[in-house]
A protein has these predicted regions:
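Short alpha-helical interface elements
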Residues: 50-54, 64, 68, 75-78, ...
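Generic preference for well-ordered secondary structure
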Residues: 9, 23, 34, 51, ...
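Hydrophobic protein-protein interaction segments
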Residues: 109-304
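Solvent-exposed, non-transmembrane amphipathic alpha-helical segments
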Residues: 45, 59, 70-73, 87, ...
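Charged, helix-prone or intrinsically disordered regulatory segments positioned adjacent to compact structured domains
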Residues: 73-76, 80-134
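Basic, Lys/Arg-rich alpha-helical nucleic-acid-recognition elements, primarily the DNA-binding modules
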Residues: 1-93
Length: 304
């Protein structure tokens, strides 16, 4: 393909997407560790009404107003006129899972590689990296619970991807892969030499897996290796019939991960989606694909 799999036309997100509102409520509830009855009490409605809300069956406008206040956003934002903001990794990755579950195609850049393309072993290493990523004084029960919940959502995403095999286009930065191989799968610097060696070998296996994808020309998976500068934040476009979302995130699942600090955004703005499409198409056009991309990564592996 000469262009990334972003479709020739630009789907427009629904102006008032009630299903998305319900999904945001569920993501908020999970992030806040609230039961449905807790939210029902705060909104002064029945638990049955909460289930209807989460299914996208909106009831009354005053309920929407109370829901907007609960989520800490304006009513316009809740109705999808503006942008979703997520200061919680739990709510953000839950929204990603929801959007992926009904997408036909996703186009993404993650640093260093998309979690959906990693091995099953990576899930185990990611837990180690997250445990290492913060000082012991901050490693309380709440942080441990956050790790468990994020990893649970990520595993659901990966399982769903393996079942439905939606079309994926992944942009991978060559410089980011070089840094990935240099550090290995570590949550912080300064680990013992033996541990560092083990983590570097694990990183090599993940990169070798990407090489296999490139050489095999796997159906439904397009990968472009980009030598140009890549954005510092990760992004992903979710596409389905008649709608497109773009998500931008500071949360990081590679070496030196970050789940604690940052604000992610999700929007259906035609301007925002269009700008990201244009950037993706430019990066994709200049990227190395197939055996050419595999050779570039092979050269890096030979150096490490």
């Amino acid at each position: 393909l000469n262009r990334a799999a972003t479709t020739s036309r630009a789907p427009r997100g629904a102006r008032f997407n009630f299903r998305a509102i319900g999904e945001r409520l569920r993501a908020y509830r999970l992030a806040a560790e609230l039961r449905s009855e807790d939210v029902a009490e705060q909104l002064d409605i029945s638990r049955a009404a909460i289930y209807k809300l989460e299914r996208g069956e909106i009831v009354k406008i005053d309920t929407l107003e109370r829901l907007a206040a609960l989520l800490g956003v304006s009513l316009a934002n809740l109705l999808g006129v503006e942008v979703e903001y997520h200061d919680s990794a739990v709510s953000y990755f839950e929204r990603m899972r929801q959007l992926e579950s009904r997408s036909e195609r996703i186009v993404a850049h993650f640093d260093p590689i998309s979690f959906l393309l990693t091995s099953e072993d990576y899930d185990v290493w990611l837990r180690h990296m997250l445990d290492e990523s913060i000082p012991p004084t901050l490693a309380d029960r709440h942080w441990a619970n956050t790790i468990d919940r994020v990893l649970g959502i990520l595993q659901e995403r990966k399982s769903s991807f393996s079942r439905q095999r939606l079309a994926v286009t992944s942009l991978i930065g060559l410089r980011q892969i070089e840094q990935f191989l240099h550090h290995g799968l570590v949550g912080r610097l300064g680990l013992p030499p033996g541990v560092q060696l083990e983590r570097k070998m694990a990183a090599r296996r993940e990169v070798a897996r990407i090489v296999e994808f490139l050489e095999a020309d796997t159906t439904g998976v397009q990968i472009g290796i980009v030598s140009d500068n890549m954005p510092n934040e990760t992004f992903q476009i979710f596409e389905a019939q008649g709608e497109a979302y773009v998500a931008v995130s500071p949360f990081r699942l590679g070496e030196l991960p970050n789940l604690r600090t940052g604000i992610a955004t999700i929007t259906t703005s035609p301007d925002g989606v269009g700008m990201y499409r244009a950037m993706i198409d430019r990066l994709w056009a200049d990227s190395a694909k197939g055996k050419e991309g595999a050779a570039l990564l092979g050269q890096l592996l030979a150096r490490f």
